[in-house]
Each structure stands twice: as structure tokens, then as C-alpha cells.
């Protein structure tokens, strides 16, 4: 339905906004991996790939990806583990999703509108 799409699009715009903030600090990344519950939706991953205008890779066993990533980070900072290379294994890719070029221009305009609405209503968040 339209309401479901609006929610997915709004969350995706929020993710795009975060990625744009990261790009402001460091634009030197090419690989983006998708993990977690949202990765079960090929529709959503394709929408994100289009918004980000980047290929997204779905990791094998992506439902465990976030927890595994946190566990690996914890192990990486553990001074008792001397061989740090054993922690990081090559990520197995289950599927890749490419941007939909026809939709990119449309979503880019909608993102600018979303950003304008977000900024103009920012003061209301403190009241709510």
C-alpha cells in the first residue's frame, strides 16, 4: 500500500542522509553490505541501491551479520588476541542489487523535498 511505501521510503531517506554525512567525512568507500532484518526484502534493498546510486551486496546469512560484526569488533579490540587477521574472514556474498537508473532521478527529487520538509519541521521535534 501507499502507507507502507511511504514508511520504507522515509526510512530509506534517513539512511541516505546518514550515508551523505559519512561521505562528507570520508567519500573513499565503494563496498556497501546489507545485513539484518531489512535485508530480507529485495524490494527495499533495490530501493536503497537506487537512492544511494551504488551496488549493494547482500551477505550470506545476513540475518546474523550485525551481531557477527559487533562480536568481531569486540574481538578486534581484545588485547589477548594476537592474530587479528583470524577475526576478519572474507564476506560471502549471496546476491547483489544494482540501482534502477530510471528511478534514481525521481527519488533524488523526492529526497530533496524530504530534506526540505525535515529541516523546516525540525523545531517541532523538540515540542513533541
Predicted regions and their residues:
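Glycine/Thr-rich phosphate-binding loops that ligate phosphate moieties of nucleotide
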Residues: 1-128
Amino acid at each position: 500500500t501507499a502507507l507502507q511505501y511511504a514508511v520504507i521510503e522515509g526510512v530509506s531517506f534517513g539512511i541516505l542522509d546518514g550515508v551523505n554525512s559519512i561521505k562528507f567525512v570520508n567519500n573513499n568507500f565503494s563496498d556497501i553490505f546489507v545485513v539484518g532484518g531489512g535485508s530480507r526484502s529485495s524490494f527495499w534493498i533495490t530501493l536503497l541501491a537506487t537512492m544511494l546510486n551504488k551496488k549493494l551486496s547482500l551477505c550470506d546469512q545476513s540475518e546474523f551479520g550485525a551481531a557477527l560484526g559487533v562480536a568481531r569488533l569486540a574481538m578486534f579490540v581484545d588485547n589477548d588476541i594476537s592474530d587479528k587477521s583470524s577475526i576478519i574472514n572474507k564476506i560471502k556474498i549471496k546476491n547483489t542489487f544494482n540501482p534502477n537508473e530510471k528511478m534514481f532521478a525521481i527519488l533524488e527529487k523526492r529526497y530533496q523535498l524530504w530534506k526540505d520538509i525535515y529541516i523546516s519541521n525540525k523545531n517541532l521535534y523538540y515540542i513533541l
